[in-house]
């Protein structure tokens, strides 16, 4: 069984939790292939790639888990900046690519700049990139980083 999202309000604000649901990729085999710091890494076999992008902690990894119906497939954390490399998951006919978030992250300026270079390099060099899932936080107006990535897309 897959997982879906439930939005719950508590004393501290809103919380996104998972709940049983039908996940579109739940019946497919999904394998974690690896984490790569270089956007030029060539994946074999060459398959179309669907990338997940958005601010740090917007829910990219959680969405990937929900779509595949595998709660712990992509690592998630309440701490922004958990994903620091290009994390690759292979399905039978395509890859899901979990990218580092942009904006706030509990990392040094040097590391944040490296994450940004990885993401920008990924979008400008990947010939196998066929789709993008761009997550925006509806609680906030688009940031300067959101607008910059809009131009990149």
Task: For the regions a language model picked out, list residue spans one by one.
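Glycine-rich, phosphate-binding/catalytic loops in enzymes
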Residues: 69-70, 112-115, 149-153
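Conserved G1/Walker A P-loop phosphate-binding module
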Residues: 5-8, 12-104
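Short, well-ordered secondary-structure micro-motifs
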Residues: 43, 107-108, 143-147
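Conserved nucleotide-sensing/catalytic segment adjacent to the nucleotide-binding pocket
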Residues: 92-127
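Conserved C-terminal guanine-recognition region of P-loop GTPase G domains, centered on the G4
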Residues: 120-153
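Short, flexible loop segments at the rims of nucleotide/cofactor-binding pockets, characterized by
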Residues: 73-75, 108-112, 137-141
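Amphipathic alpha-helical transducer elements in NTP-driven molecular machines
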Residues: 83, 112-116, 143-144
